């Protein structure tokens, strides 16, 4: 009887642990710890005090095409910015809507009729504040501004401050980068999406310092994602084709502000010329893992945006060059990536 009870207990423990994910499956439905699909699109991840925080666009259930717009301007009502937390990068707990839409003021930047895209959060060590920047736009994408919000906690609530046209230029697809020296940069597409700007933020991260560079002029590079390794800065971008996929490109520089040198498409494998039907959004350094960087893509479903999926893939280095090989499934193993399932194709 004792052995039977012990066996039963072991089976129960195994059953409990089987509920938790132990691998990442790019492009498949990814559910949170409550069993609901993760809703954090165009997002980025902050690592703070031993926990990862994933912020993203909270998409509504109804996708529609904005009236009077002559391109595939599909959207949902702006649902604010969501946050999920994780200790292991596999299992994510929903922390709620940390930047809530302003449903009462139709003139607000964050009213549901507006566009809130590509939120990114960084922590300011001097002020102790969590600072969020995002792309703010009107329903027809004519406003093309950058918005900023602040919080005392990584799980909010964030207080929306204002929007602006940084350095007198429009701002659309964007990311943030915090350097080793504590300086932070806002990287965004501008000049009608033709040129990428890299702007140094003020010490409190709440405004632009006036120092900026223009990069890849008239190349229409979009959706920037950036990281730094061994003193070299890397940036992955997409082309500019709306919701539709295109070929990624990566570039390198000795300084965040440039000059940047375009290299090639880093993707390898099936549908590499379409970035595996994804678009870059963020590059996630894995804490405690040498050369552990995860390339985060969104796999957009433009006619049902809430069902857009996530493609997370490990970056592989060959000297100073990087590649992003397609894998059906993979997981983290000590200091290296271990590939599982049917992978390199």
Show where each model-derived region lies:
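Carbohydrate-active catalytic/glycan-binding domains of CAZyme proteins
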Residues: 20-345
């Amino acid at each position: 009887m004792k052995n039977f009870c012990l066996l039963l207990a072991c089976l129960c423990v195994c059953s409990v642990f089987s509920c938790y994910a132990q691998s990442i499956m790019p492009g498949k439905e990814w559910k949170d710890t409550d069993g609901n699909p993760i809703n954090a699109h165009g997002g980025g991840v902050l690592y703070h005090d031993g926990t990862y925080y994933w912020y993203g666009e909270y998409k509504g259930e109804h996708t529609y095409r904005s009236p009077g717009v002559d391109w595939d301007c599909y959207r949902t009502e702006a649902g604010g910015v969501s946050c999920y937390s994780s200790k292991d990068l596999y299992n994510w707990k929903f922390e709620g809507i940390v930047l809530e839409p302003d449903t009462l003021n139709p003139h607000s930047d964050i009213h549901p009729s507006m566009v809130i895209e590509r939120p990114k959060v960084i922590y300011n060590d001097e002020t102790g504040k969590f600072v969020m920047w995002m792309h703010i736009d009107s329903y027809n994408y004519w406003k093309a501004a950058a918005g900023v919000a602040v919080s005392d906690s990584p799980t909010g609530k964030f207080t929306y401050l204002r929007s602006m046209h940084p350095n007198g230029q429009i701002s659309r697809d964007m990311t943030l980068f915090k350097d080793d020296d504590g300086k932070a940069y806002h990287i965004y597409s501008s000049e009608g999406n033709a040129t990428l700007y890299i702007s140094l933020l003020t010490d409190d991260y709440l405004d632009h310092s006036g120092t900026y560079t223009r990069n890849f002029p008239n190349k229409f590079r979009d959706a920037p994602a950036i990281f730094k390794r061994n003193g070299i800065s890397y940036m992955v971008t997409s082309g500019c084709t709306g919701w539709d996929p295109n070929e990624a490109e990566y570039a390198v520089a000795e300084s965040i502000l440039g000059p940047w040198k375009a290299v090639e498409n880093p993707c390898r494998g099936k549908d590499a010329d379409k970035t595996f039907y994804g678009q870059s959004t963020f590059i996630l350094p894995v804490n405690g893992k040498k050369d552990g960087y995860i390339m985060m893509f969104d796999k957009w479903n433009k006619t049902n945006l809430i069902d857009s999926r996530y493609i997370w893939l490990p970056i592989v280095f060959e000297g100073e060059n990087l590649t992003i090989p397609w894998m059906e499934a993979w997981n983290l193993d000590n200091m290296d990536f271990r590939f599982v399932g049917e992978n390199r194709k």
